[in-house]
């Protein structure tokens, strides 16, 4: 009995020893003390994982600064600006932190994690500032000009439509783990009993067509798809992951065919002729607080699956011209201009007209051009401006139009500040983007019936409408335009015929080649080709030409990309529900059988191929299903995409407080003038063309379908003249150091609203009002912001030193490190430091000097008892040659040669020891 008792006591002691630490740790975790420190440790570890992956990405890019691969060009085209990049990084740190904690679920009770812990993770990762609602300014200016970021367009929902916020979800996403893993992530995951077909197989069997087999559109010009691409770049950009390497393990996404976040490679069939088994693909960045970031917390997991971010404003606001962040806007403006102009290219002109300025990054080189002479990419409001010359041409048109308008406004209203002229021109350019898109472009895409059904007439601003671009619109529906891209770039002469000196080019010969525009004729030949040559017709069995499926972004023989497969994979990455779910969303019937599918597609051969690949109608990817539908009458889309595009366009219009038709934005007279304007008028005012079609999107023959520019209506800008009297007691300031001001009226009084340039902070009253005694307060001043003092969110990576500059900051590296492409992180350049080269040179000189000294000492010591002579042999030889020539009568040259046979090191100037 005593033995049993002793054993029981021992078991209790052992059990206590084993379980007490865990119980104590659990108590501390539940209490918050240990858990908080553990969370800090996890976030710090995750930050290292993410930053190391980003660092390795930039280091690889630095080593590959020659001809870029297609995957690198795609990453470059989707490179986020600094604010988007910071949010993407924060989201990835937060998501990685949650993944670490998920692996520890066996140790911790996930239900015990509180909202405080979530806030701690969000704050430490850097996500929290982007999740909090912003403060909306309460000045008269807030109703006069739209903010560059779109924030506070809707004052009740300040982030609706703003840049760097999540894309809207019209249906819940479908992820294989319920909150983050894409469709097709797990090879053994079945949908209705079948795996999803590889996207490359879908491309090969259903989408791809040879360049020669395309059918041309007999109604619409090549300007139609180019405008669609341009407008898409105004309202949506989904940044890719900031890293092209896996966060766990750091493997390069271009070198692996395994799914390791953010790598989600496109698998190739086993019989593919390519040397690799897959094409690289990088997942889109998650928006802060979504996906894995929310799944661990019971109160968020059901409502907060992974969302993707839109780096641009959702609004039709000409962000292609002005950017979607203060940093980009600062780069684009000409701050020395008193008329509020945009920057232009200082190196090149197009027959006296401006080009876009250059960005710091080099684009694809001209053949044979030395590395130092490579033409940089163009700098515009959107980073994709250099993708193709046609897109760059449209960007350039609007740069010129802004400067034309701003110059005219300043001449009409000489009292306007530079900022007022800039904002008024920006306001008009934004309105023209809205008019051309909604009046001239969208009705052609939807057809008249669908336009009336889904868009209808404007009935005023509706603050309950969310204008945020939806995920399905950006990732699927509006990508219908890829099926209308022609494989050729046509450049025409002044008679609108093929240019003898500028032959047609295949699309892959113009990707990221701005030198084609600058050195080969400028804008005019490109614009003529867009106006007078047809677009590709979207035919069901000719959906996408091989320039896009086999040669996308190809600059050399190093790899390729496939746009169709990218679109399908992106839809799966974003968790878009299938084709039938979206038909049901739009009030259309589900199509469950091949016979039912044929009613919507009207092509039995294509239906059979679809069912053979997907096995079940509910498995069909929404982009393919919408693309395959037969057109509605007078449209260029089928019923599903007409519904999605129509709903989105109505939301963009009705949910925009600054829509041009809203009563407070323009006067009645100004709206009438704006309605007169058109894309052909913009072309007339900003190119050398003298004849244009009345509708830039309709294909026509020259000259019968073209009108003289004198016949194309234009706006009367005198309607923007301000006539209100200025009180002598309230004189406008001539300038504001490091800032600007605009004026407006509030309760019948003149008000000046001040703002500072990006990088400066306002000190004093933002708004001053004119009273009977003059301005009611002193004007504020703009003080430099010391970004380097921000220790919570330092502007530079820890590898770099932050140096404050006026209005900005600079990240500085120590030799031999150099700044990476984010201009914030120091990357090993792979060369020796300059100091090392200096040390090597000094060392060589020192060794040489010591050797010479040693040689002299040795010579003198060894010949101390002999006659030591230092000979400069060249001189001695010449002297002996002259002596011998005198004695023997031979020439000095011959005597010199004879001596040379006897003298050591003939001709040397080295001092020798004899």
Curated annotation (Swiss-Prot):
Residues 860-914 are cytoplasmic. Pfam families: An_peroxidase, EGF_CA, Sushi. Belongs to the peroxidase family. XPO subfamily. Keywords: Calcium, Disulfide bond, EGF-like domain, Glycoprotein, Heme, Hydrogen peroxide, Iron, Membrane, Metal-binding, Oxidoreductase, Peroxidase, Signal, Sushi, Thyroid hormones biosynthesis, Transmembrane, Transmembrane helix. Heme is covalently bound through a H(2)O(2)-dependent autocatalytic process. Heme insertion is important for the delivery of protein at the cell surface. Residues 32-834 are extracellular. Residues 1-31 form the signal peptide. Pathway: Hormone biosynthesis; thyroid hormone biosynthesis. It is found in: Membrane. Glycans are attached at residues 123, 271, 299, 334, 603. The keyword Zinc does not apply. Its main location: membrane. Heme b binds at residues 232, 387, 482. Its cofactor is Ca(2+); heme b. It comes from Rattus norvegicus (Rat). Residues 784-827 form the EGF-like domain. Disulfide bonds join 136-152, 253-263, 257-278, 586-643, 684-709, 730-770, 756-782, 788-802, 796-811, 813-826. GO terms for cellular component: cell surface; extracellular space; membrane. The lineage of its organism: Eukaryota, Metazoa, Chordata, Craniata, Vertebrata. The keyword Chloroplast does not apply. InterPro entries: EGF-like_Ca-bd_dom (IPR001881), EGF-like_dom (IPR000742), EGF-type_Asp/Asn_hydroxyl_site (IPR000152), EGF_Ca-bd_CS (IPR018097), Haem_peroxidase_animal (IPR019791), Haem_peroxidase_sf (IPR010255), Haem_peroxidase_sf_animal (IPR037120), NOTCH1_EGF-like (IPR049883). This is Thyroid peroxidase.
